[in-house]
UniProtKB/Swiss-Prot annotation:
Name of the molecule in the record: Cysteine--tRNA ligase
SMART domains, alphabetized: DALR_2
A single MF term (Gene Ontology): cysteine-tRNA ligase activity
Residues with Phosphoserine modification: S270
Pfam families in the cross-refs: CysS_C, DALR_2, tRNA-synt_1e
Quaternary structure note: Monomer.
Keyword Zinc set for record: yes
Group of enzyme by EC: ligase
Entry keyword Transit peptide: no
Lineage per the UniProt record: Bacteria, Bacillati, Bacillota, Bacilli, Bacillales
Length: 465
């Protein structure tokens, strides 16, 4: 079965057929860099990084572009409040963004274009829209003629008449129509600006992504993605700008991730329940946060709470423990035994099941359920008296490959095998010397590290719990 993708544009799942065989052009809207990112910003970074990884796993060559909005009203306001200039603030939070997403297991995009590095491209785009009659200039501002684009509203599934009822013109604006939106904003006193055919100013938000997506990926791209909150007006306006200019579809598939709620309340600044990634990863393993995000289908809302985060931590630890136990058993395993073909077939079936789930609109939640079944089967196998290196290797390979698809690490902050053996030896010596208090202390220390000891007539054996 081919990969099926839910397309916001058509509101249904469709077979994923890229424009060029085995090549995928993917554009993901990045952050406005005026502060540290919050967990709502982290979700699309994690989700679309995982989708990119899965497409690569399935053999596609993915060209992945994600932008930085490094000049806009929020940045100008932050610069004014902090007494710094816009480029300094943007640079600081771009660096912070990379630190945060790297901690969360996200790979960098192939290109991270910045608005300030593409002003000429944006100006040329606007000039062409004016030439085609889709835009007009008023006193240094340039607006897009929304009604001129007959398909306006097709992504958010709203009609122009419905939109008009909620539209209004702000004081001082000179639009022809309340639905028109800014492509270029004339600079106010003291604001950062660039020279343009319409005077000093800066780009509007929506035009930036249209211009940069076209520059780096071409007129039509395979996947355009972002948070659900960007569907309207941002992505709707991108379509209007890009398709008016080129006369071609802007993107074939539109993917949007769901919202994050905090303790069953929508995350919002007014409620003061924003959680910065910068802060939370000091308290929580970033891998746990990633695992938590992927444990829910990307289109569904997530409820963020400490109990759910703890459940994610416990679940991830169970998977890592199964992997660690397999590695521990590897050296003591033998060659193929009689029922190994049955186990190898079972492992292959679980791999295929993972692929089936991920092929169904990148269902990481069900993919993770398959990983738990893989861990369960591994634990059953390790209960056998004789285990084979080939089967252990097959289990290990699947853990490693599927964890990599999800951007997760199998490393544990734990004692090394050599450290465990050394502590067991100390405990044996303590018991010989009848120092039972020390022996019990060592057992308790190992138990706290999830190491279970079994005293047998043949000596002390251990396993990870």
């Amino acid at each position: 079965m081919s990969i099926q993708v839910y397309n916001t544009l058509t509101r249904k799942k469709e077979p994923f057929i890229p424009l060029e065989p085995n090549k995928v052009k993917m554009y993901v809207c990045g952050p406005t860099v005026y502060n540290y990112i919050h967990i709502g910003n982290a979700r699309p970074a994690i989700v679309f990084d995982t989708i990119r990884r899965y497409l690569q796993f399935r053999g596609y060559e993915v060209q992945y572009v994600s932008n930085f909005t490094d000049v806009d009203d929020k940045l100008i306001r932050a610069a004014r409040e902090l007494g710094e200039d816009v480029p300094t603030i943007a640079e600081r939070f771009i660096e912070a963004y990379f630190e945060d997403i790297t901690a969360l297991g996200c790979k960098k995009a192939d290109v991270h274009p910045r608005v300030t590095e593409n002003i000429d491209t944006i100006i040329q785009f606007i000039e062409q829209l004016i030439e085609k009659g889709y835009a007009y200039e008023v006193d240094g501002d340039v607006y897009y003629r929304t009604r001129r684009f007959s398909d306006y509203g097709k992504l958010s599934h709203q009609s122009v008449d419905e939109l008009k009822s909620g539209a209004r013109i702000e004081v001082g604006e000179k639009k022809e129509d309340p639905l028109d939106f800014a492509l270029w904003k004339a600079a106010k006193e003291g604001e950062i600006y660039w020279d343009s055919p319409w005077g000093k100013g800066r780009p509007g938000w929506h035009i930036e992504c249209s211009a940069m997506a076209r520059k780096y990926l071409g007129d039509t791209i395979d996947i355009h993605a972002g948070g659900q909150d960007l569907t309207f007006p941002h992505h709707e306006n991108e379509i209007a700008q890009s398709e008016a200019l080129t006369g071609k579809p802007f993107a074939k598939y539109w993917l949007h991730n769901g919202y994050i709620n905090i303790d069953n309340e929508k995350m919002s600044k007014s409620l003061g329940n924003f959680i910065l990634v910068h802060d939370i990863i000091k308290q929580v393993d970033p891998q746990v946060l990633r695992f938590f995000m992927l444990s829910v289908h990307y289109r569904h809302p997530i409820n963020y709470s400490q109990p759910l985060l703890e459940s994610a931590r416990s679940g991830l630890e169970r998977l890592k423990t199964a992997y660690a136990n397999l590695k521990h058993r590897l050296e003591s395993s033998t060659n193929l035994t009689t029922n190994d073909e049955q186990w190898l077939a079972k492992i292959e079936e679980l791999r295929n099941e993972f692929i089936r789930e991920m092929d169904d609109d990148f269902n990481t939640a069900n993919g993770i359920a398959v990983l738990f079944e893989l861990a369960k089967q591994a634990n059953v196998y390790l209960m056998e008296n004789h285990t084979s290196q080939q089967v252990i290797q097959a289990f290990l390979q699947q853990f490693e490959q599927l964890f990599d698809v999800l951007g997760l690490s199998l490393q544990q902050d734990e004692l090394l095998d050599e450290e465990i053996e050394a502590l067991i030896q100390q405990r044996i010596e303590a018991r010989k010397n009848r120092d039972f208090a020390l022996a019990d202390r060592i057992r308790d220390e190992l138990k706290a590290k999830n190491i279970i000891l079994e005293d047998t007539p043949q000596g002390t054996r251990w396993r990870r719990g």
